């Protein structure tokens, strides 16, 4: 390989030889151009366009490092954004030096609400703003010297990318989940099972007796993607429905802060719940932070318990409970206001509130009026708000249900703290042993019956375990005196014997709402015939591209108008919507689906496209996937699930993105498209760079860089302002652009500073004034090797002293361990210590053997200066693939050690002894020391304590 300035008059050479920001910028530009021109970071694939042209075999040792898909924001990057990108680059560079084939690249997650909202604010088409944002982000990241393989970069908005997003959607759409095999299978394998009757239809109808439309509907009920007329979060202000995860605790949209209402709509759903057990159980296979695993377990919310059948007005009301042992304490029932039986029960009940406790009626005359008014009052509440609401409200339905264990008639209510999304949407209320039920019973004057011993129910619900009491009937059930586990088991056994219930498992996880009424997203590869039957488009018709439209804004409504209906922007593009297609039985008229996929779609599989980005025939060749992400039991153990070797990003994606991508990946695994069971083998959550922000007396943020500090107070344009600490961002007026730091100090200085600020997984405060410390370290490194006046190299051929070798090999050993474990802050500390030692020891010229390994060790964290120094030391190849230095054990231990000697706990002298000296020898040397001998003369030596390698303590009187 050649070097950037070889054979030319380099701009860097025309500058002064001192390592100034100007020289740093020139060096960085040249080496960045060199890396691009030479394809330095291009990682070869086993097969396909990215395979080695010379046919050489790839290293068996590989590493796939990945950053979380960034949004190309219109605001650009601030210095907090590159923290994770720099860390993964350091890790990737280090591993290249270990001889590994390293895949590291970066793409852009550009569909979805953030990009669309920004485009609407600026009045520019989202495609235009997105492309401009991507180019700006490429420029900003490129200036940091990140070692990405540019051939593998993708954007979720590129039709050649979302063609495969649509293709994967179709694979999921054309699959069903086989409960017996616990895996996805093609729909084509379901149809013969329906025809033979081996698997019944969901409603029990004879499949062979159904007409074409009915057969299609019967099949659709098994699909992993289906349309459901269900309760969704409708946001009129945004003109779209939102997933639960996109709604704040106070019932507003996360983006835009608009009111959100619960509404019944027909929407695309993905049957992620079919994978609940695998999504929980396979967490044990992953090298992820326990905090993230716990968040996913809690989100899925697996609970073991029983379904119990209560009866009311000829209807069966099934409840799910984890505590069937408390059935004898159930004194009322509560249904979710949206429960399908509410209106049926009201119509069959008394129809009147005559003689009913006024607390149960909510001020209404009839149950029907009360239900209607109550539903209206809670329409704007989110699920989270309903669950957290301390004020218990509800209304009586005018009916009673029969408790199956004792025959008691108990009143039936609706209340907002019961949700349709968990369990069965109905609960048996046991106020003596559940806090929320206790609060409700207290407000409504309902009976509280103790059935678990150990508490004082006159004061509060008793929710701990204890022996069952007051729990027996004359039908063969008596659990009095049993502990909880045994009481639960016996109750379930009795319920099953009497066919009044059954043991079961329930989950909090709901199916994934997979449609948005927006413009800027992936179109669905689905059309509908005149009967409304959905048809998946064949692969030959992909991608279904977004039409170019003039009016791409969503049809939004009065934010408070809960009765409004979604009207997707794509519905306006009639020429695109209404099509004539031949789907195998002649040309017919169809209409396209006018919803788009949610912003999570592209990020649910993008790591696989990084592997094979130029493949026109497959989303990812299986041989390439197996090489980069396939299981490696010989390296990672027999239960290795495979996946990306290191995935770095913020903990805010712990549930949504990671859960969705795991679901998609498992479907692809079941269908044989990937060899890895999981998308990400190891996950690392980096911390955040935070900063001070300042507000004036009106609470308005002022530019942080213009604030002055005087006597512990802060002033902006002469007015005192208030300091606060937290996020960095444009709206807070405290964002620092990486462009400015690179221009004023150099990219290597920014990299070193961000990596030295503290452990990668913790948050840390940004302070521009401290950046100079990183710059001075690099300047000292430069001066070790380069004469600032002449530009001459200051090295000489000379053997290292024993002291040199000790410092060098200890630095190598420490740095290797720290790089391998992402402790880059301590890498920088060790390199600074070694540079300081060399600076002090060699003020003029320096042995080449002392600095060659130093340059290699510096190169992952400060690659540009390392490349330049490597060149000056006589090398013609890039330092990128130079083998990382190794250490010799003999230099890691001392022949002699110095130990402090204490007398009665106070240090009185220091002694030098052989590193392997016995305790007797150490005491002998200590007692012979002149200072110690004087201190203990004439005193009694009571005790002699030796802590090997650390100290000696003599106790005297």
Swiss-Prot record:
<dbReference type="GO" id="GO:0006429">
    <property type="term" value="P:leucyl-tRNA aminoacylation"/>
</dbReference>
<feature type="short sequence motif" description="'KMSKS' region">
    <location>
        <begin position="727"/>
        <end position="731"/>
    </location>
</feature>
<keyword id="KW-0648">Protein biosynthesis</keyword>
<dbReference type="InterPro" id="IPR002302">
    <property type="entry name" value="Leu-tRNA-ligase"/>
</dbReference>
<dbReference type="GO" id="GO:0005829">
    <property type="term" value="C:cytosol"/>
</dbReference>
<comment type="similarity">
    <text>Belongs to the class-I aminoacyl-tRNA synthetase family.</text>
</comment>
<dbReference type="Pfam" id="PF08264">
    <property type="entry name" value="Anticodon_1"/>
</dbReference>
<feature type="binding site">
    <location>
        <position position="730"/>
    </location>
    <ligand>
        <name>ATP</name>
    </ligand>
</feature>
<dbReference type="Pfam" id="PF13603">
    <property type="entry name" value="tRNA-synt_1_2"/>
</dbReference>
<dbReference type="InterPro" id="IPR013155">
    <property type="entry name" value="M/V/L/I-tRNA-synth_anticd-bd"/>
</dbReference>
<dbReference type="GO" id="GO:0004823">
    <property type="term" value="F:leucine-tRNA ligase activity"/>
</dbReference>
<dbReference type="InterPro" id="IPR009008">
    <property type="entry name" value="Val/Leu/Ile-tRNA-synth_edit"/>
</dbReference>
<dbReference type="InterPro" id="IPR009080">
    <property type="entry name" value="tRNAsynth_Ia_anticodon-bd"/>
</dbReference>
<dbReference type="InterPro" id="IPR001412">
    <property type="entry name" value="aa-tRNA-synth_I_CS"/>
</dbReference>
<dbReference type="InterPro" id="IPR015413">
    <property type="entry name" value="Methionyl/Leucyl_tRNA_Synth"/>
</dbReference>
<keyword id="KW-0030">Aminoacyl-tRNA synthetase</keyword>
<dbReference type="Pfam" id="PF09334">
    <property type="entry name" value="tRNA-synt_1g"/>
</dbReference>
<dbReference type="InterPro" id="IPR025709">
    <property type="entry name" value="Leu_tRNA-synth_edit"/>
</dbReference>
<keyword id="KW-0067">ATP-binding</keyword>
<dbReference type="GO" id="GO:0002161">
    <property type="term" value="F:aminoacyl-tRNA deacylase activity"/>
</dbReference>
<keyword id="KW-0963">Cytoplasm</keyword>
<feature type="short sequence motif" description="'HIGH' region">
    <location>
        <begin position="70"/>
        <end position="81"/>
    </location>
</feature>
<dbReference type="InterPro" id="IPR014729">
    <property type="entry name" value="Rossmann-like_a/b/a_fold"/>
</dbReference>
<dbReference type="GO" id="GO:0005524">
    <property type="term" value="F:ATP binding"/>
</dbReference>
<keyword id="KW-0547">Nucleotide-binding</keyword>
<keyword id="KW-0436">Ligase</keyword>
<protein>
    <recommendedName>
        <fullName>Leucine--tRNA ligase</fullName>
        <ecNumber>6.1.1.4</ecNumber>
    </recommendedName>
</protein>
């Amino acid at each position: 390989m050649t070097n950037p300035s070889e054979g030319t008059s380099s701009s860097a050479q025309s500058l002064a030889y001192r390592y100034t920001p100007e020289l740093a910028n020139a060096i960085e530009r040249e080496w960045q151009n060199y890396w691009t021109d030479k394809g330095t970071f291009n990682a070869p694939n086993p097969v396909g366009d990215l395979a080695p042209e010379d046919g050489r075999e790839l290293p068996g040792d590989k590493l796939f490092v990945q950053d979380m898909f960034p949004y190309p924001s219109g605001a650009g990057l601030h210095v907090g954004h590159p923290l994770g990108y720099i860390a993964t680059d350091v890790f990737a560079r280090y591993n290249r030096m270990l001889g590994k084939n390293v895949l590291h690249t970066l793409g852009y997650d550009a569909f979805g609400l953030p990009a669309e909202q920004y485009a609407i604010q600026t009045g520019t088409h989202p495609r235009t703003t997105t492309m401009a944002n991507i180019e700006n982000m490429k420029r900003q990241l490129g200036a940091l010297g990140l070692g990405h393989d540019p051939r593998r970069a993708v954007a979720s908005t590129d039709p050649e990318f979302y063609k495969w997003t649509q293709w994967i959607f179709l694979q999921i759409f054309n699959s069903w989940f086989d409960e017996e095999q616990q895996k996805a299978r093609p729909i084509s394998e379901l149809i013969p099972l329906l025809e033979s009757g081996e698997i019944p239809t969901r409603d029990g109808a004879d499949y062979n007796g159904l007409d074409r439309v009915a057969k299609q509907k019967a099949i659709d009920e098994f699909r992993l993607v289906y349309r459901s007329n269900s309760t969704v979060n409708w946001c009129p202000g945004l003109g779209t429905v939102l997933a639960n995860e996109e709604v704040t605790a106070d019932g507003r949209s996360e983006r835009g802060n608009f009111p959100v209402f619960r509404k019944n709509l027909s929407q695309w759903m993905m049957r992620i719940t079919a994978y609940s057990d695998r999504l929980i159980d396979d967490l044990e296979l992953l090298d992820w932070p326990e905090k993230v695993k716990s968040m996913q377990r809690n989100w899925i919310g697996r609970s073991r318990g029983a379904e119990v059948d209560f009866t009311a007005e000829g209807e069966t009301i099934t409840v799910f409970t984890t505590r069937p042992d408390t059935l004898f304490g159930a004194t009322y029932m509560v249904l979710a206001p949206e429960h399908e039986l509410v209106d049926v029960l009201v119509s069959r009940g008394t129809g009147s509130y005559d003689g009913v406790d006024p607390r149960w009626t909510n001020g209404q005359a009839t149950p029907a009026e009360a239900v209607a008014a109550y539903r209206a009052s809670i329409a704007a509440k989110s699920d989270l708000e309903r669950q957290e609401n301390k004020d218990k409200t509800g209304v009586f339905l005018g009916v009673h249900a029969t408790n199956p264990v004792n025959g008691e008639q108990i009143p039936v209510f609706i209340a907002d703290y019961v949700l349709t999304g968990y369990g069965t949407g109905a609960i048996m209320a046991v106020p003596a042993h559940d806090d929320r039920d206790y609060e409700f019973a207290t407000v409504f004057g309902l009976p509280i019956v103790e059935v678990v011993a150990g508490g004082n129910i006159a004061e509060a619900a008793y929710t701990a375990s204890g022996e069952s009491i007051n729990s027996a009937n004359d039908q063969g059930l008596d659990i009095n005196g049993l502990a909880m586990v045994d009481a639960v088991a016996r109750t379930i056994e009795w319920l099953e014997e009497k066919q009044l219930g059954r043991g079961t498992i329930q989950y909090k996880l709901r199916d994934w709402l997979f449609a948005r009424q927006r413009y800027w997203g992936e179109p669905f590869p689905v059309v509908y015939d005149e009967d409304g039957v959905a048809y998946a488009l064949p692969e030959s018709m992909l991608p279904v591209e977004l039409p170019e439209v003039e009016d791409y804004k969503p049809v939004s409504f009065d934010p408070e108008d809960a009765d409004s209906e979604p009207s997707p922007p794509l519905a306006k593009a009639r020429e695109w919507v209404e099509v004539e297609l031949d789907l195998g039985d002649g040309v017919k008229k169809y209409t396209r689906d006018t919803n788009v996929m949610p912003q999570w779609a592209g990020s649910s599989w993008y790591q696989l496209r990084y592997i094979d980005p130029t493949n026109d025939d497959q989303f990812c060749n299986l041989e390439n996937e197996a090489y980069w992400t396939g299981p490696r039991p010989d390296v990672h153990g027999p239960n290795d699930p495979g996946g990306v070797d290191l995935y770095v990003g913020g903990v805010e994606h712990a549930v949504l993105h990671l859960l969705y991508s795991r679901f998609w990946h498992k479907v692809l695994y079941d269908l044989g498209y990937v060899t890895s069971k999981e998308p990400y083998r190891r996950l690392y959550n980096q911390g955040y760079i935070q900063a001070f922000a300042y507000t004036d007396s009106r609470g308005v943020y002022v530019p942080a860089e213009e604030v002055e500090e005087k006597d512990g107070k802060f002033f902006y344009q002469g007015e005192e302002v208030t300091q606060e600490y937290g996020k960095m961002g444009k709206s807070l007026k405290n964002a620092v652009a990486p462009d400015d730091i690179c221009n004023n100090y150099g990219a290597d200085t920014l990299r070193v500073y961000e990596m030295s600020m503290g452990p990668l997984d913790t948050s840390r405060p940004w302070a521009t004034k401290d950046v100079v410390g990183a710059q001075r370290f690099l300047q000292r490194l430069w001066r070790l090797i380069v004469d600032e006046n002449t530009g001459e190299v200051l090295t000489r051929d000379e053997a290292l002293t024993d002291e040199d070798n000790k410092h060098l090999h200890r630095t190598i050993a420490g740095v290797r361990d720290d790089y391998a474990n992402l402790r880059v802050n301590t890498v920088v500390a060790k390199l600074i210590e070694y540079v300081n030692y060399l600076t002090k020891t060699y003020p003029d010229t320096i042995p080449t053997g002392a600095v060659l390994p130093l340059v290699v060790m510096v190169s992952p964290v400060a690659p540009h200066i390392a490349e330049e120094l490597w060149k000056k030391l006589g090398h013609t190849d890039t330092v990128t693939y130079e083998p990382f230095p190794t250490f010799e054990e003999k230099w890691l231990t001392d022949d002699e050690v110095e130990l402090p000697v204490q007398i009665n706990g106070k240090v009185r002298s220091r002694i030098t002894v052989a590193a392997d000296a016995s305790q007797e020898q150490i005491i002998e040397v200590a007692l012979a020391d002149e200072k110690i001998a004087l201190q203990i003369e004439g005193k009694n030596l009571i005790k002699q304590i030796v802590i090997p390698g650390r100290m000696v303590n003599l106790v005297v009187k």
